[in-house]
Amino acid sequence: MANGHRSQIKRERNAVKDTRPSAKLSYARVSVQKACFVLDAIRGKSLDEALAIVMYNPRYASSIIEKLLKSAAANAENNNGMDPSKLYVEECYANKGPTMKRVHPRAQGRAYRIEKRMSHITVVLNER
């Protein structure tokens, strides 16, 4: 058990809280592997460059990540008072979410399983 009063513990926990602007999408209906193709392309890029990359990327995940980038940029501007022209993608990752299991009927009464995978996508921005 931690020593100290509950309010003191909360104060200490909030002191080390990450204040970088971010956006997170949970339960995105795209697999982690497919989302990572787009995320790898924008990692470390400036915000304008990252938005240009996802805008012209034909993958389905890029439309989801474009919304996330715009949301994180709005969070940076409105909540943190950061300049949008100085922002860059510091972190972006996709974690595994739950899997929906579906059945695909096959010949002679068999059934194959289809796994519809989900992911939790996070984008973290910062100022240069």
Curated annotation (Swiss-Prot):
GO terms for molecular function: rRNA binding; structural constituent of ribosome. Residues 9-20 have a biased composition (Basic and acidic residues). The keyword Flavoprotein does not apply. Pfam families: Ribosomal_L22. Residues 1-20 are annotated as: Disordered. Gene3D superfamilies: Ribosomal protein L22/L17. It comes from the Bacteria. GO terms for cellular component: cytosolic large ribosomal subunit. Keywords: Ribonucleoprotein, Ribosomal protein, RNA-binding, rRNA-binding. CDD domains: Ribosomal_L22. One of its GO terms (biological process) is translation. Transmembrane segments: none annotated. InterPro entries: Ribosomal_uL22 (IPR001063), Ribosomal_uL22_bac/chlpt-type (IPR005727), Ribosomal_uL22_bac/org-type (IPR047867), Ribosomal_uL22_CS (IPR018260), Ribosomal_uL22_sf (IPR036394). HAMAP family: Ribosomal_uL22_B. PANTHER family: CHLOROPLAST 50S RIBOSOMAL PROTEIN L22-RELATED (PTHR13501), LARGE RIBOSOMAL SUBUNIT PROTEIN UL22M (PTHR13501:SF8). Belongs to the universal ribosomal protein uL22 family. Part of the 50S ribosomal subunit. This protein binds specifically to 23S rRNA; its binding is stimulated by other ribosomal proteins, e.g. L4, L17, and L20. It is important during the early stages of 50S assembly. It makes multiple contacts with different domains of the 23S rRNA in the assembled 50S subunit and ribosome. This is Large ribosomal subunit protein uL22. It comes from Lachnospira eligens (strain ATCC 27750 / DSM 3376 / VPI C15-48 / C15-B4).
